[in-house]
Regions:
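Glycine-rich phosphate-binding loop of ATP-dependent small-molecule kinases
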Residues: 1-217
Length: 217
């Protein structure tokens, strides 16, 4: 049983590492980014508002996100086996999450912070694109699709509107201002562990796995 929070600025690789952690430790990935994008895809009233906010580099309101998160926490099949990716983003959300978990007789067991510099973030975000068919994510600086890959051909590759340098910088600055106090919140609870987000995907995952294995031992 493990509830884990994964921190790091946009582009730090939280989604990639979450996928690995979910697979190895049989956790449910609660990605607020995925939840919000689904609302946008559905073109609901809230989804259209979310689209404008994200494109401008700002964050969605706490109340909206908290309601979506509670829908997952309240589901018994996910009890004490959730990895929170992209939430909580600020101190208000962190306190709200604690209250929600207590309400459903759960707690946070570990908080991981992927430490990543702005220059790396700019390349990861501005160079990011994905396959419209399978959803696989690539990067023109670090990870180009194979020329032998029929699915992820040039015709099927797309780039999100908010994946550009200006938005990357604004999102990083917003993250530093609003999210870093949350790190202190978990540090005071002695739940925070820092991981080198500048390393390769495999090295970062190895470092994360070692930390989780010690907790679960």
């Amino acid at each position: 049983m493990l509830n884990l929070v994964l921190f790091g600025p946009p582009g730090a690789g939280k989604g990639t590492q979450s996928d690995f952690i979910v697979s190895k430790y049989n956790l449910f990935q609660l990605s607020t980014g995925d939840i919000l994008r689904q609302e946008i895809k559905n073109k609901s009233e809230v989804g259209l508002k979310i689209q404008k906010i994200i494109n401008s580099g700002n964050l969605v309101s706490d109340d909206t996100v908290d309601r979506l998160v509670e829908n997952i926490i309240s589901d018994k099949k996910y009890k004490s086996r959730i990895i929170f990716d992209g939430y909580p983003r600020n101190l208000s959300q962190a306190k709200a999450l604690d209250e929600l978990l207590i309400k459903y007789k759960q707690k946070i067991d570990l908080a991981l912070n992927l430490m990543t510099q702005l220059e790396t973030i700019k390349k990861r975000i501005s160079g990011r694109f994905s396959c419209s068919k399978c959803g696989k994510i690539y990067n023109k600086f670090f990870n180009l699709p194979s020329t032998k890959n029929d699915c992820c051909s040039k015709k099927s590759l797309i780039k999100r509107d908010d994946d550009n340098v200006d938005v990357a910088i604004k999102r990083f600055e917003t993250y530093k201002k609003q999210t870093e106090p949350v790190l202190d919140f978990y540090k005071k609870k002695k739940l925070l562990k820092e991981v080198n987000g500048e390393s390769s995907i495999d090295k970062t995952y190895k470092e994360i796995s070692d930390i989780i294995d010690l907790i679960e031992a």
